[in-house]
């Protein structure tokens, strides 16, 4: 198994697919990285040389923010919104949907399990 950005990527998959196991790299970014390094799309991870793995690792470290750094930045952005006290920050603080979705009936994922109301029987 090759280890890139602190993640063990599977050896039997194509490089473009295997790179997507890294948090912050999707299909488009994976293709961009492989074309930048000069690796064909049909190459599998176990066929890569050590130099190619090193080139991929350096390209990711140099040009992209992935894994722990990306998670940290996202959480810091949410914390900043909460500290500012803006509308989006308040919605995050109250664990409600942030992007304008309705909450009267849905939003159970964000609000958690339904809480029973005392005295309401049919």
Curated annotation (Swiss-Prot):
Keywords: Ribonucleoprotein, Ribosomal protein, RNA-binding, rRNA-binding, tRNA-binding
Gene Ontology molecular-function annotations: rRNA binding; structural constituent of ribosome; tRNA binding
One of the Pfam families matching this protein, by short name: Ribosomal_S13
GO biological process entries: translation
InterPro entries xref list: Rbsml_uS13_C, Ribosomal_uS13, Ribosomal_uS13-like_H2TH, Ribosomal_uS13_bac-type, Ribosomal_uS13_CS
Gene3D superfamilies assigned: 1.10.8.50, 30s ribosomal protein s13, domain 2
Location of region: Disordered: 93-122
Cellular component GO terms held in the UniProt record: cytosol; small ribosomal subunit
PANTHER family: 30S RIBOSOMAL PROTEIN S13/40S RIBOSOMAL PROTEIN S18 (PTHR10871), SMALL RIBOSOMAL SUBUNIT PROTEIN US13M (PTHR10871:SF1)
Quaternary context: Part of the 30S ribosomal subunit. Forms a loose heterodimer with protein S19. Forms two bridges to the 50S subunit in the 70S ribosome.
Protein name according to UniProt: Small ribosomal subunit protein uS13
Classification of source organism: Bacteria, Pseudomonadati, Pseudomonadota, Alphaproteobacteria, Hyphomicrobiales
């Amino acid at each position: 198994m090759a280890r890139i950005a602190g993640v063990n990527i599977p050896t039997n998959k194509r490089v473009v697919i295997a790179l997507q196991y890294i948090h912050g790299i999707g299909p488009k970014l994976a293709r961009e990285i492989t074309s930048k390094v000069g690796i064909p799309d049909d190459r599998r991870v176990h066929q890569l040389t050590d130099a190619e793995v090193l080139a991929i690792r350096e390209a990711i470290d140099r040009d992209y923010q992935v894994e722990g750094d990306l998670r940290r930045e996202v959480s810091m952005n949410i914390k900043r919104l909460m500290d500012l006290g803006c509308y989006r920050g308040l919605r995050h603080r109250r664990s409600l949907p942030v992007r304008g979705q309705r909450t009267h009936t849905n939003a159970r994922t964000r609000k958690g399990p339904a809480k029973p109301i005392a005295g309401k029987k049919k």
